[in-house]
């Protein structure tokens, strides 16, 4: 039998997950009665499975999120756009969290097990494919402050708790002894993931459609984190996220449509093995 554990925060919509697993035509289980999907609602900055129990681990994009936001970012919200003291704080937190993540997963893995981690990255020079998209969002947020749609205090609290790493940062724990917590690197690659919306734009030339696709991507992935800084959200106002997201999306579409740009991103894949 194969037991598959899906791990996410307790607030995750596990009902939707199991609906997909039961009805999606591309579901991995299909009709195999020997595959048993399960779910665990817990942060991966804790132990999530018993020691020496995992044969194969897979983490897609989640490891980019930090255990906590270590600093505000003056003038921006995107960690790769930070400088000085703020940048140093994110680098320290990124290093600490990566080692904590590896240590916890190592304890859960059986000897001979493999762990595959896929996550967004940046180049060694600090270049992120999302920089222009983030700058457009940052400018739209500044407009919202000027309009009174959000307060300056709310804007200052807006920080993405993510930290895209350089390849060298992923490999740093393994450089001294060749292993870390009995984990060794079998493969580590960084490559460019093309912007599919840009590919569509090259064919149809529709600037507004391009801008809408890019803004909707930003809305789905990043806006909930930014909206958590809103006083109304903290007070439990269920409409606050929608009204904030609608206004920010409109501002981004307006800017992106006048300055079409590709948001090709860097993706890293690291494959780790636990020694016997």
Describe each region flagged by the PLM.
Residues 40-43, 86, 91-104, 165-172:
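A Trp-anchored, charged/polar loop motif used as the substrate-binding/catalytic surface
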Residues 14-47:
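S-adenosyl-L-methionine
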Residues 178, 263-276:
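Core SAM-dependent methyltransferase catalytic element
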Residues 3-8:
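Conserved SAM-binding motif I beta-strand of class I
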Residues 9-12, 64, 122-124, 190, ...:
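Conserved beta-strand elements of beta-rich interaction domains across eukaryotes
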Residues 111-236:
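Substrate-binding/catalytic lobe of Class I Rossmann-like enzymes that use SAM or dcSAM, i.e.
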Residues 59-100, 108, 119-158:
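Mobile active-site "lid"/loop adjacent to the S-adenosyl-L-methionine
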């Amino acid at each position: 039998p194969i037991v598959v554990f899906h791990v996410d925060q307790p607030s995750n919509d596990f009902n939707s997950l199991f609906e997909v697993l039961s009805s999606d035509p591309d579901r991995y289980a299909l009709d195999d009665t020997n595959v048993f999907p399960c779910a665990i609602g817990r942060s991966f900055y804790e132990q999530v499975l018993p020691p020496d129990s995992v044969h194969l681990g897979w983490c897609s994009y989640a490891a980019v999120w930090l255990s906590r936001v270590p600093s505000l970012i003056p003038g921006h919200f995107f960690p790769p756009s930070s400088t000085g003291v703020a940048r140093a704080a994110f680098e320290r937190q990124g290093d600490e969290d990566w080692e904590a993540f590896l240590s916890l997963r190592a304890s859960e893995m059986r000897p001979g097990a493999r762990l595959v981690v896929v996550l967004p990255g940046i180049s060694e020079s600090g270049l992120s494919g999302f920089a222009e998209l983030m700058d457009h969002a940052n400018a739209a947020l500044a407009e919202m402050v000027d309009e009174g749609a959000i307060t300056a205090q709310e804007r200052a609290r807006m920080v993405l708790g993510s930290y895209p790493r350089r390849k060298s940062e992923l490999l740093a724990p393994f450089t001294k002894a060749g292993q870390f917590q009995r984990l060794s690197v079998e493969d580590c690659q960084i490559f460019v993931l093309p912007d599919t919306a840009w590919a569509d734009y090259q064919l149809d030339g529709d600037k507004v459609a391009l801008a809408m696709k890019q803004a909707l991507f930003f809305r789905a992935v990043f806006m909930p984190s930014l909206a958590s800084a809103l006083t109304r959200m903290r007070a439990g106002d269920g409409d606050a996220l929608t009204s904030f997201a609608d206004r920010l999306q409109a501002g981004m579409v307006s800017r992106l449509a006048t300055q079409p740009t590709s948001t090709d991103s860097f993706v890293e894949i690291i494959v780790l093995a636990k020694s016997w």
